[in-house]
Amino acid sequence: LNAEEPPSTCLMWLAYTMNGVVWNEDGRFNKESVLEALKYMETLINEELVAPEDKTSSGMDAYMRICGGTASFLTGPTSFVSRSQNEELCSVVGQIQPILVPGKEGKAAQTMPLPEAIGVNKLSENKEAAKKFVEWYTSADMQKQLNKTNSAIPTRNSVLEELINDGTIQNSGAMLEQAKIVSSPFPNGVPSYYAQMSSAMYNAINKMALGELNAEQAYDEMASALEELINE
């Protein structure tokens, strides 16, 4: 819950898996959904289910808890599916399995990918060359290579299925089934002001984690910042 990107994506994921919505069509937060997710996070903090050091440590340090056996559940980068099978990185190999993301009742109907992506900058002077790079980088062969060298999980479901079936990705659990319910929480695509919006989100969440704001105040702070961004 440090003031960096992971708390923002955590809030998005919670709201989206709980209620199927984060932003309304006009780009503003869906207050009911986002506030419910914030209150859930606040409950975890108040009931001391968040390790004190995770309020100020990096997201990667928090993620690595799953590989050290000090966490029982992780929502984070899919690369940890492969990391959890690497004895050099994980002390509990064989004890971790991907499951379908839970919803408020039973399984969630949808989940989301992280908002990072690769594309061609509108200011690029070599758009065709850049497009070819994107096509190469996201090709099936390159996705296999990136899994081998970087533990990156393929975004192509066909490649993911192939690596699971040939045993490259082991202990895959519900990963393939999960991949089929991934969708974007952004009704109009990722906004141009995403970085500023995310900053407002994670700073408000961090203040809540440190006891400086309650859930309602955290929501008001981030919603106010988003309103300013929309009106610029």
What are the roles of these predicted feature ranges?
Residues 53-67:
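Short helix-initiation/N-cap motifs at beta->coil->alpha
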Residues 98-100, 148-200, 207:
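Long, aromatic- and glycine/proline-rich binding clefts that accommodate carbohydrate-like moieties
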Residues 215-226:
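Short, well-structured alpha-helical segments that form the helix of a local strand-helix-strand
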Residues 1-30, 71:
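Extracytoplasmic/periplasmic solute-binding protein
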Residues 26-55, 97, 101:
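Glycine-centered hinge/linker elements that transmit conformational signals in sensory
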Residues 72-77:
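Paired acidic/hydrophobic, glycine-rich loop segments that form the ligand-binding mouth/hinge
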Residues 18-19, 44-49, 70, 84-88, ...:
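Sec/Tat-exported extracytoplasmic proteins
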Residues 47, 87-152, 203:
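Extracytoplasmic/periplasmic substrate-recognition and gating elements
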